[in-house]
Amino acid sequence: MIRVYNYASYHIEAIEKIGLARINCADGPVGWACFMDKTRFYDTCSFCSQTLVATSWNKDIANRFGKTVGDEGIIGNEKGDKSPYSGWYAPGVNIHRSPFGGRNFEYYSEDGMLSGIMAAEQIKGCNSKGVFTFVKHFAVNEQETHRSISGDSSYLT
């Protein structure tokens, strides 16, 4: 378990005892991304921000966004090690509490209801393609400055 936890950056380690194969995961509410290695993603799109999706008030658009990300997860690593991306570190569901929020582009709206509805549709779309999601940043992620000094924000969200 220590190995699974300590070495699980952007993937889930294989656990032979229970028959779990290694699973590739990636970040990016606006598409597949990895700030640690910018060359990991081939032929995948950068999408619009979550805020723009929410301004449409259109659940179908959010669902299609999720489906497209799911499709890209399956084929997006074909020029890399040929392993699909099965887990997506998104969507971000915090709300816009301040215009100075460092990650507002990752969140849908200041309206919690709208944010939840749009996130649910995006998740349904992505899951329908066999890619699971890690809903992130429920709260306590209002700034980027000094965010990692204590590390609490990352674990709480």
Protein language model features and the residues they cover:
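Glycoside hydrolase catalytic-domain context in secreted enzymes
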Residues: 1-157
